[in-house]
Amino acid sequence: MIITLKLEGAFGSFDRASEDWYRLIEIESNADLETLHLCIQDAVNFENDHLYEFFIANSVRSSAKRRFDNENQGLWEYSIGDLFPLPKHKKLFYLFDYGDSWYFRITKSRKKIEQEEAG
């Protein structure tokens, strides 16, 4: 089943001028987090040249996090469908580039990506 995810700038290298920035991503619910990472890289035109992680927490700055990365595993063991619905008050975040700290919040969306009409 294909689900739509909304990717929003959450913290770090995003400035206040980009508060309403977002991207929608359509992806199979059985796709693993590595596949989601590659979709995000494509959606934001990054070059996949830095380390990254996903984590579930109340906020970006929460000390209590459930992490998914190369060291803690989880990138290939969990599908997107395994993570949603998230526990109450929890959010899914994606951190790319520990130096520049690009933080994104990922939520399920009911909005679908509009297809461009051929013309």
Locations of regions flagged by a protein language model:
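Short linear regulatory motifs enriched in tryptophan with gly/pro/ser
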Residues: 1-119
